A protein has these predicted regions:
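Helix-loop boundary and gating motifs at the non-cytosolic
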Residues: 28-75, 229-267
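Hydrophobic core of transmembrane alpha-helices in multi-pass small-molecule transporters
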Residues: 40, 109, 119-136, 237, ...
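Interfacial helix-cap and linker-helix signal at transmembrane-aqueous boundaries
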Residues: 57-58, 88-89, 160, 175-180, ...
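Loop-to-transmembrane helix entry/capping segments in MFS-fold secondary transporters
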Residues: 64-65, 149-161, 261, 345-357
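Structural signature of the two symmetry-related core transmembrane helices
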Residues: 97-111, 293-308
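Cytoplasmic helix-loop-helix junction between adjacent transmembrane helices
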Residues: 127-161
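Symmetry-related core transmembrane helices of the 12-TM Major Facilitator Superfamily/SLC fold
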Residues: 185-201, 383-401
Length: 408
């Protein structure tokens, strides 16, 4: 037997043994660790950007308004790129190729940051790398659900490794930036992006199947206009808009309140630990409660979280409580949202459904980053986070009145 074949068989047997050891036997032949490894590195990149990108731009001397604009640019690209790549993925069926090319072009595009640190050049780098970065995840989500087939509720058991990658990154970089200058920040991002490229080469392909699923008739537009679907997508944008001040300025806000970068990294990690625990519980939650109830609870807790962060973040116990609420504002929201998208579109429209989710999340995130950038210095953190709270409450009202009560 050739050595390369024997090595592959060895790792396959190890993968199966580990999956069985942790009670995941029903997911075989799911390539659990290969999918999980990709999520780990993909969200490690988010863990490197969400807490520290604004801090890096502040280190370069940009104003709050400019920081808000630079952070919003990747989110604006999220409004454009996923729809193009989603249509291409559904049309060609070559989703894994799109994932691999997107990961490689993300790395190459971001590497241009080493040429200049001017505002115009950084804006170009943010737009270029984000155009390809946002091509990756929606297509990979379709591949993951294709591997899961009739067990979509187990998505969270794979996705939780993305949260692990986020946690490791924020802790490591938080400590690192206490000892070293933020000038090394772009190098750290390039290393993580290289990991995404390598993991994309390790993942096997899979295509969505309609077998065992209730037939969903009509094209993408007809499915999109089904009862409750437009309302759901509106709430996606509102939820991400409510996160705008958090993702853009919470690190700077906590620094101004006297927290060290190491502690800030741990606080970010705490939120994602809560998210991981929620992912582990989501299968049981979605089997017991309707998507409508889970989404409503997520939005209401998000509204409360932003009020706490905007008004009482100087109290550590309040800050700890607010970070634990990340379990709802991202964990339960994202898992239930993915379940909603997966059940609402047929196999031939899954890529477009995921792309629209990413697009509207980008619209909301960009709007949130922009208004936070312009209001932070003029209105202050309390008013800025209060506006975020209102957006989350609006999403709760829409879900309560427009989404039907049924089980995931």
């Amino acid at each position: 037997m050739p050595r390369c074949v024997s090595v592959r068989l060895y790792w396959a047997s190890c993968e199966t043994a580990i999956v069985k050891r942790y009670g995941l036997t029903t997911m075989a032949p799911l390539p659990y660790w290969r999918l999980s490894g990709f999520y780990l590195f993909y969200f490690a990149l988010l863990g490197a950007t969400a807490p520290f990108l604004a801090l890096y731009f502040h280190h370069l001397g940009f104003s709050s308004a400019r920081i808000g604009e630079l952070v919003a640019i990747p989110m604006l690209m999220r409004c454009v790129a996923p729809n193009l790549w989603g249509w291409l993925g559904d049309y060609t069926g070559k989703r894994l190729l799109i994932v691999r090319l997107g990961a490689l072009c993300t790395l190459l595009g971001f590497s241009l940051i080493f040429i200049s640190k001017s505002y115009a050049w950084l804006a170009l780098v943010m737009a270029l790398h984000a155009f390809f970065w946002h091509a990756v995840l929606p297509q990979f989500e379709v591949i993951t659900f294709a591997h899961l087939r009739e067990q979509p509720e187990r998505y969270s058991q794979v996705r939780l490794w993305g949260s692990v990658g986020f946690i490791l990154t924020v802790i490591i970089l938080g400590r690192l930036f206490e000892w070293l200058s933020l000038d090394i920040y772009p190098v750290a991002l390039v290393v993580v992006m290289a990991g995404i490229v390598l993991c994309s080469l390790w993942v096997p392909n899979a295509q969505p199947s309609s077998q065992g699923r209730k037939a969903i008739e009509g094209g993408f537009l007809k499915q999109l206009l089904s009862p409750g679907v437009p309302a759901f997508y509106i709430t996606v944008a509102l939820m991400q808009m409510s996160h705008g001040p958090y993702y853009t300025f919470i690190t700077l806000h906590l620094e101004d309140l006297g927290y060290s970068r190491g502690v800030i990294g741990l606080l970010w990690a705490l939120g994602v630990v809560a998210e991981v625990l929620m992912f582990l519980a989501m299968r049981r939650i979605l089997l017991r409660f309707s998507l409508r109830r889970v989404l409503m609870a997520s939005f209401v807790l998000a509204a409360l979280r932003w009020l706490l962060l905007g008004s009482f973040a100087e109290y550590l116990w309040v800050l700890l409580l607010a970070q634990l609420m990340h379990a709802a504002t991202f964990g339960s929201f994202h898992a239930s949202a993915m379940s909603f998208v997966q059940r609402s579109f047929g196999p031939g429209q899954q890529g477009q459904g995921q792309a629209l989710y990413a697009t509207l999340a980008g619209v909301g995130g960009a709007a949130g980053a922009l208004y936070a950038g312009y209001s932070w210095n003029t209105l202050g953190p309390t008013i800025t986070f209060s506006m975020a709270s209102l957006a989350a409450l609006a999403a709760a009202v829409i879900i309560a009145t427009r989404l039907q009560e049924d089980r995931a």
